[in-house]
């Protein structure tokens, strides 16, 4: 059986999706080898990985040369970024070393970085005519607001604004936050998507609701039937030109029946396992795209598929 090697960037806890990549590869006639790239080699991914490489920080100027050494030494075919900062690194590596012919299911770095800048992303969505919660501008008569750190993640640092006094606290710091209308009576829907890297063809979308989160990641999630969210996710990918694995976060205003984009992460979401079991085989789509094959278009994912994470232990002995 031919081998297919993956480099998981920041995928220390992605054991579940790692197993699904192995299964998808086997179904396509390949033996998958997973290599982790982490600051600490003693991580859960070691339970299924061939090796864990002690990596550099994403901001380290030597990271591209270090990843290239890893790619050439271990024969990596596909690089999978699993945390925000790794997406731009993976995309830039592919651009710097095109002769390696390593597949990265992500957009170019410029577009990826824009998605992780909430202000720049909101401006892009507005330019493309995509619906988002109205952005606050000085003087607007609205005091039901939410302020999100411009470069924040995992819901950290979010502040609700309910008074003029609270709003005044942001004077002089407006450029550090995205301030928008707050939707209190809402439903938040996550849509797992995949678009072919070369053509942009959307292979499939699968909406789900995060029932429980930890550290901003879904630990309990269920797939749902939401044609409106699915259609908006498809439109967002088409309008922005995003490629590869994409996670679209949508807010449904229940009072006014509005569907709007909260943010888009150009990578696999933490709860994507639910979408795979619901019928949208994301790992298979990524592998087929990497092999130059046309990924099989996913049918509508089954609603009501619930996944929940549980604790397990990986043991490392002194000589491991």
Q: Which stretches of residues belong to each language-model region?
A:
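ATP-binding N-terminal substructure of ATP-dependent carboxylate-amine bond-forming enzymes
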Residues: 1-104
């Amino acid at each position: 059986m031919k081998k297919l090697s993956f480099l998981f960037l920041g995928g220390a806890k992605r054991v579940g999706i790692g197993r699904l990549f192995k299964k998808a590869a086997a179904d396509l006639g390949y033996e998958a080898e997973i290599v982790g790239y982490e600051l600490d080699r003693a991580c859960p991914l070691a339970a299924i990985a061939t090796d864990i490489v002690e990596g550099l920080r994403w901001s380290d100027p030597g990271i591209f040369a270090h990843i290239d050494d890893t790619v050439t030494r271990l024969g990596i075919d596909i690089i999978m970024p699993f945390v925000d900062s790794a997406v731009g690194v993976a995309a830039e590596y592919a651009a710097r070393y095109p002769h390696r012919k390593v597949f990265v299911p992500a957009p170019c770095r410029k577009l990826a970085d824009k998605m992780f800048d909430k202000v720049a992303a909101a401006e892009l969505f507005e330019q493309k005519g995509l619906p988002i919660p109205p952005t606050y501008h000085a003087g607007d008569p609205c005091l039901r607001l939410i302020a999100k750190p411009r470069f924040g993640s995992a819901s950290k640092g979010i502040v609700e604004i309910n008074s003029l006094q609270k709003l005044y606290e942001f004077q002089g710091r407006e450029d550090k936050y995205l301030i928008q209308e707050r939707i209190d009576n809402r439903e938040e829907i996550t849509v797992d998507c995949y678009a072919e890297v070369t053509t942009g063809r959307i292979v499939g979308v699968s909406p789900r609701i995060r029932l429980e989160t930890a550290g901003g990641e879904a630990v309990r999630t269920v797939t749902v039937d939401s044609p409106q969210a699915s259609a908006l996710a498809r439109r967002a990918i088409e309008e922005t030109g995003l490629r590869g694995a994409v996670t679209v976060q949508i807010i449904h205003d229940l009072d006014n029946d509005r569907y709007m984009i909260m943010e888009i992460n150009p990578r696999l979401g933490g709860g994507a396992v639910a979408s795979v079991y619901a019928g949208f085989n994301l790992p298979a789509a990524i592998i087929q795209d990497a092999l130059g094959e046309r990924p099989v278009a996913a049918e509508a994912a089954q609603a009501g598929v619930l996944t929940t994470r549980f604790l397990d232990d990986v043991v490392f002995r002194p000589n491991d």
